[in-house]
Amino acid sequence: MKKQDLMSIDEIQKLADPDMQKVNQNILAQLNSDVPLIGQLGFYIVQGGGKRIRPLIAVLAARSLGFEGSNSITCATFVEFIHTASLLHDDVVDESDMRRGRATANAEFGNAASVLVGDFIYTRAFQLVAQLESLKILSIMADATNVLAEGEVQQLMNVNDPETSEANYMRVIYSKTARLFEVAGQAAAIVAGGTEAQEKALQDYGRYLGTAFQLVDDVLDYSANTQALGKNVGDDLAEGKPTLPLLHAMRHGNAQQAALIREAIEQGGKREAIDEVLAIMTEHKSLDYAMNRAKEEAQKAVDAIEILPESEYKQALISLAYLSVDRNY
């Protein structure tokens, strides 16, 4: 498939719209609770925008294997719920006050409510998996949530630590982001009755796409504008998170530059250092380095699903991979 033949994001969304409407309806239905605060906070976060890329992968993956049932909708919903719950917990841990262009749930409702409703959404996800009556998917999801939690703890340990290695950083990306993308593709393949090779292909697609997606997010933290990004530019540095662009700039800078970045990571919270850090990144092409790594991962995602039968849904998955590294939000 040539780059000029790629589908636009609007075309992909139009193709997936019948399924995604059902996913969105299911998300809202599953947030129902006799406890009013659960619904209020749940609706607040799920209606706050977001790319819905994980459920999109699930419905496109199932369709790419010719599946027309409803279990792919359940897969898409439970994957989005795990992601949503992790965001609620993330924002509390990071003390974030802005996401997707508006106040975070913890800023609006408080930390305790965010953590507890996050727990509710996590457990609701497991109820949804139980509906699929697939021990394999349950096992995959249980492992993924455990890996995600490990990634959260590892990232917490990395905060304010300039000695974080690139390998360590990439493990965190896999645990926190790529693993759940994997689940979206793999679970969809299982409910669609795909072969082992097709299941592996869609699992690999998810892993590579998830890695590319997070790498781009880390680049955008330094190169986007606040309105497009939907959060404060430079949040990672302010939070003392050593992401790939920072690690690259520190490794390639001179002693004075490396010391400045080390201090910025160790101290965190110093937004006034951003301009200096950006200048160092620009000099050493650190953002380009991270973006090129993202493009390599996106290409691996495309190559992974070469074995899938030709269809507009396969084209959509291919296009989605390329589009994920060609965005400013």
Curated annotation (Swiss-Prot):
An all-trans-polyprenyl diphosphate binds at residues 99, 176-177, 214. Keywords: Isoprene biosynthesis, Magnesium, Metal-binding, Transferase. GO terms for biological process: isoprenoid biosynthetic process. Transmembrane segments: none annotated. It is an enzyme of class 2 (transferase). The keyword Metal-binding applies. Its EC number is 2.5.1.90. Binds 2 Mg(2+) ions per subunit. Mg(2+) 2 binds at residues 90, 94. InterPro entries: Isoprenoid_synthase_dom_sf (IPR008949), Polyprenyl_synt (IPR000092), Polyprenyl_synt_CS (IPR033749). Isopentenyl diphosphate binds at residues 51, 54, 83, 100. Mg(2+) 1 binds at residues 90, 94. SUPFAM superfamilies: Terpenoid synthases. NCBIfam families: PRK10888.1. This is Octaprenyl diphosphate synthase. It comes from Haemophilus influenzae (strain ATCC 51907 / DSM 11121 / KW20 / Rd). The gene is ispB.
